[in-house]
């Protein structure tokens, strides 16, 4: 059986999702504070949070244009992805962070993502290990709480697809606060 090699990560972008949406790479940053469409940020967040797999066009359309009477949601998606790529160009230059592949889009596996949500979740999991000393656990909880800058993607909190994730991270936050008390 032939194994496919893991792609080599060329660059790693730091992504903040807790308390706001920001990307930082090589000292250049981009955040949702700039005046852009919320759908643009939402589609970008969806791609990053689902970076482990190609996302079919149909999934994007069901998620972002469910009852939209748009005459051509496929074209609307392509236009939006073009705008996202243009917005990301100052960060990535020639490296394309978003790839198209057989009716789907995916986050380029050569672009690593360091997400605050992943670090937050990992710290909470480590802190819940009862085999650790109380002091070590409290240090881990403090580190986790310092990462939690607010709810997940607060400007996009009306998005149905985000609600379960937001509830999960907020629940972890409340558990960490309670454990620290």
Residues of each region from the PLM?
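DNA-recognition element of transcription regulators
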Residues: 36-45, 70-91
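Short amphipathic alpha-helical recognition elements used for nucleic-acid or partner binding
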Residues: 31-64, 84
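Intrinsically disordered, charged and Pro/Gly-enriched terminal/linker segments
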Residues: 32-33, 49, 69-73, 93, ...
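Short boundary/linker motifs that mark transitions into or out of structured domains
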Residues: 1-43, 95-105, 150
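Positively charged, aromatic-enriched patches within helix-turn-helix-type DNA-binding elements
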Residues: 23, 50-77, 159
């Amino acid at each position: 059986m032939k194994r496919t090699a893991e792609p080599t990560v060329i660059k790693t972008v730091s992504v903040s999702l807790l308390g706001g949406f920001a990307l930082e790479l090589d000292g250049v940053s981009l955040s949702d504070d700039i005046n852009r469409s919320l759908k643009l940020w939402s589609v970008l967040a969806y791609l990053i949070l689902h970076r482990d797999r190609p996302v079919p066009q149909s999934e994007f359309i069901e998620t972002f244009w469910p009852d939209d009477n748009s005459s051509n949601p496929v074209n609307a998606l392509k236009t939006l992805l073009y705008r996202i790529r243009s917005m990301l160009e100052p960060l990535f230059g020639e490296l394309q962070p978003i790839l198209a592949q057989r009716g789907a889009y995916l986050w380029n596996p050569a672009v690593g993502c360091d997400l605050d949500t992943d670090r937050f979740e990992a710290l909470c999991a480590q802190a819940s290990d009862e085999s650790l000393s109380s002091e070590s656990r409290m240090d881990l909880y403090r580190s986790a709480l310092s990462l939690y800058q607010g709810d997940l993607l607060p400007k996009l909190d009306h998005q149905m697809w985000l609600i379960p994730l937001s509830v999960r991270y907020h629940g972890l936050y409340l558990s960490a606060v309670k454990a620290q008390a």
